[in-house]
Amino acid sequence: MLIVGAGPAGGHLARLLAGRGVDVLLVDQLPDLSRAAFSSAAMPLEAVESFGLPAEVVASRWRSWQLIGPGQSSRHWSSALPLGVVLDFGALRLWLAEQCRGWGGRVELGLRALGYEEVSGGLLTHLRQSDGRPVAVRSSWVVDASGQGRALLGDPPDLVVGRGVEWLLQVKPSQWQRWAEQLTFLLGSDWVPQGYGWVFPMQCGRLKLGVCRLDQPVRGASSFRQRPLGPDLQTLLHRLDLDGAGVLDRHGGLIRSRIDRCEPHGRGRLIGLGDAVSTANLLGGEGIRHAMASAGLLAPLLLQERDPDRLRRRYQRQLSKHFGWRWPLSGRLARRTWLALRDRRADHRLERLLAGLETCQAADLSALLFDYRFERYGLRALPYLLGWR
């Protein structure tokens, strides 16, 4: 079994299959899995427990939500008990790879997948080492867990693209305390046009500050679509009194997903996993939990099925059932909210939506933003979700 991509999806699948005695080779183009750790990495507490993640991959816990904007408005929801964690993304990847090794799997880094061909009984995958030397791997199955780049699957049509930049900051303990134990989002066209910003606490004295924007072409909005993210992040630093912070790391990344997830999940013995089959959610940019969930669904099918077409049908059906009807609705809300968020009229529309949340509990906000339980809004939200307001 060849798994291309040692992110949360590929690493978790490798861990599960190696634990069942499967001969697994997990490869990644990165020479070091602690590098390029772009992920806001917030996760609800129940998911941490479900995946059996250890304390070593948890950077901090949170129990509150803070939404700042549009403008200077600020809303806060707090729980007496922890609601979730912020993961150390690099530590998570390293731990999953070590789990794979511990169960007898192999992990090889610095290998980029170039293509594959069908051979008797399986596939021959062509890879290239960082020094340019070619490598060929023969396997019964190949899983493309290479993320939004879809190294082997290739791109489906109608992808919605989100671009993000994140800085890891070193701040004074007093500054860190202001953001501790809460997830903060910055909303509105004066904060991040056609997107949003965030401040997440890491270990004491460290914060993640980031911005993300959707850039699907929109008629009459090219100036917003092409605006670089760097100035927005600098603006956040200044407005949040963080411009004196030390910058420990700078990284960026893409989310590219189809809202309806109606895309090929594989070809023959090549199967897509995680972000490669649009499991990254466009509303809040969440990808880790959904990527790992897709691995949990695929692993038993790879153990049970021998027929590629039947496996792929079952896999796609189970993924669709797992995400449910709320998933495409969350994508529509993301496109409706972020792409339109470029003027005061859009800010006012968002303000009305947020006002409806003020009587909610912190757990209700988690249910909305992590589980997409839009029905808690009631009928008053439907016109907004459907684009009538």
What residues fall within each predicted segment?
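Short loop/edge segments at beta-strand edges and connector loops
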Residues: R93-L94, L109-L111, D249-H251
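C-terminal helical "tail/cap" subdomain of flavin- and related membrane-associated enzymes
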Residues: P300-R389
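A conserved beta-strand/loop capping segment in the N-terminal third of enzymes
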Residues: L45-A97
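N-terminal Rossmann-fold NAD(P) dinucleotide-binding loop
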Residues: G10-G11
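Glycine-rich FAD pyrophosphate-binding loop
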Residues: V4-A6, R15-F38
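Predominantly flavin-linked oxidoreductase catalytic cores and closely associated redox partners
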Residues: A6, L16, R20, Q99-G244
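Conserved N-terminal glycine-rich FAD pyrophosphate-binding loop of Rossmann-like flavoproteins
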Residues: L30-P54
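FAD/FMN-dependent oxidoreductases across multiple families
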Residues: D215-L301, D307-D309
